[in-house]
Amino acid sequence: MAARSELLRPAFGEASPSLGRFVINPHSCSYRWWHMFLIMLVLYSAWASPFELSMEKAASIALVVTDLVVDVFFAIDIALSFFVAYRDTSTGLLITDRRKITMRYLKRPCFALDVASTIPLQIIYQLVTGKRQGLWGLLNLLRLWRLRRVSKLFARVEKDIRFNYLWTRLIKLLCVTLFALHFAACIYLWMAFNYKIKELTWIGSQIHSFEDRSVWFCYTCAVYWSITTLATVGYGDLHATNIGEMLFSIAFMLFNMGLTSYIIGNITNLVVRETSNTFKMRDMVQRVSEFGRMNRLPEAMREQMLASVQLRFRTDEQLQQEMLSELPKAVRSGVMKHMFKSAIESCYLFQGVSDSLIVQLVAEMKAEFFPPKANVILENETSTDCYIIISGEVEALTTLADGTEKHVKRIGPRGMAGEIGVMFSIPQPFTIRSRRLTQVVRISHIHLLQAVRPNTADGYIVFSNFIQYLESLKVQTKDVAFVSDHLWNGNSMVLRRATEVAVDESKEAAHKMLPCKEPKRVVIHEQLPNATSTALHPSPGKLVLLPDSMQELMKLSEKKFGKAVRGILTVEGAEVEDIEVIRDGDHLLFS
């Protein structure tokens, strides 16, 4: 029953709290069952206390004996409260010291009210004076202090996901309404039975000698008037006839206004909360439809957009991403590893890699759903992501010279799509389209390279798997122009380097294993001292291949010119800080 936030938690650096002798854990099952038993007694007290007050003859021997038994149980609970550990709100620690527990309970106002609501003051007053009527009968209402336990119960149940929040709130509102009706009806009866002139009461003006009628007849009349007043219908058959009843009716109707507003506001909030996703989906579908009409999109494209939007809401894709993003990174990685590790390990590109690389890859993966006939990747678009098929099926298509699409192959679960463009750093060669409802996980180009670069051995395995896949793809699709062009022509050097590179632990070898474009060629010059104008017309330099890092470039310059190099400048005099900004054919000066 308890929410997770109520579990015991020690302070940072301290061991879990241990309970001392004769100290009760407030979150133990036995103590919670005791609380649930007391809740049943509280419900009885909430009904019996106003009912016994309303009419003297309502307090029968059976009710009096039951009240005494209930008071005994609450007296036992008061005694147990001196042994129940509590949580310090300032530190969040569970206090188990008996002396602190006792002093805290004695100093709190609830101790005095607990005792006052448990002592049978009305019975003692009746035994001493022999009277029950009068204002002393109101002491019986002190037992309503126990209702705070019900409020705490509802607050705890509302946070418990095992219970439906909607029904919990509705039951709470119903209980509040029923208690308000019952309490008002009992007060109306108490005022009528204690007024001197019975004919000048709300019930006496309509029913003569009502005090001789049965208890349940009078109670039914009182509940009837109470509920008509609460519902603001007011048939007029019953009405206030003296000043006291008028004043109480005014107070009761003011209370009814607030209670009605509270109930309407809560129910409205619950209904809106239950239907908010439907409203969002309808609004999004309407906006997508209007967007398609305004921009005169083809009908097939509009249907794809609508299907994607509807699928997104049906699968709660956005909710899943928001939920995962709020989790700590370690927890999120553990969840993603549990969900997608087997799929990645069985994917051809990552077969045989280490578990550490798998963990790095799943940490930033994102799950997505695609409806049937939806384009996952478009041909010739920028290669930013590759996809692993978790369920469903997609097909690879290529566009011929006449504009028609030609089927290349089908890709089922555990297959990959988009990896060719990512590995070669070229536009996507195929259009990838889903054949039915398909779930995929997306790996970004940047994250894939960041995960593979530091892992030299894993990088070798990845690119070896990729080469084998391209070989098999060429055999399967002999008539697809892309495969022959890129496998044997433009990237033949890349493939040879990937297969011939030895597994080296150095950082340079890890970079060489990655597919790269044709090396850049630059001209390096030795900057002449005290010659500002030479920067614009430098002396003839040396044509070299651009290395992979600034450190290698400076070492190469020192080797060529035979002197230490402190920095690298362009011919315009700008200092170069990143090797990536240097273009093919640039002239560089060294200082």
UniProtKB/Swiss-Prot annotation:
GO terms for cellular component: monoatomic ion channel complex. It is found in: Membrane. It is a multi-pass membrane protein. It comes from the Eukaryota. Probable inward-rectifying potassium channel. Assuming opened or closed conformations in response to the voltage difference across the membrane, the channel is activated by hyperpolarization. Disulfide bonds: none annotated. Belongs to the potassium channel family. Plant (TC 1.A.1.4) subfamily. SUPFAM superfamilies: cAMP-binding domain-like, Voltage-gated potassium channels. It holds the Pfam family KHA. Residues 521-591 form the KHA domain. The chain crosses the membrane at residues 33-53, 64-84, 110-130, 138-158, 173-193, 247-267. A nucleoside 3',5'-cyclic phosphate binds at residues 349-469. InterPro entries: cNMP-bd_dom, cNMP-bd_dom_sf, Ion_trans_dom, K_chnl_volt-dep_EAG/ELK/ERG, KAT/AKT, KHA_dom, RmlC-like_jellyroll. Residues 1-32, 85-109, 159-172, 268-591 are cytoplasmic. SMART domains: cNMP. Keywords: Ion channel, Ion transport, Membrane, Potassium, Potassium channel, Potassium transport, Transmembrane, Transmembrane helix, Transport, Voltage-gated channel. PROSITE patterns: CNMP_BINDING_3, KHA. One of its GO terms (molecular function) is voltage-gated potassium channel activity. CDD domains: CAP_ED. This is Potassium channel KAT4. Residues 221-240 dip into the membrane without crossing it.
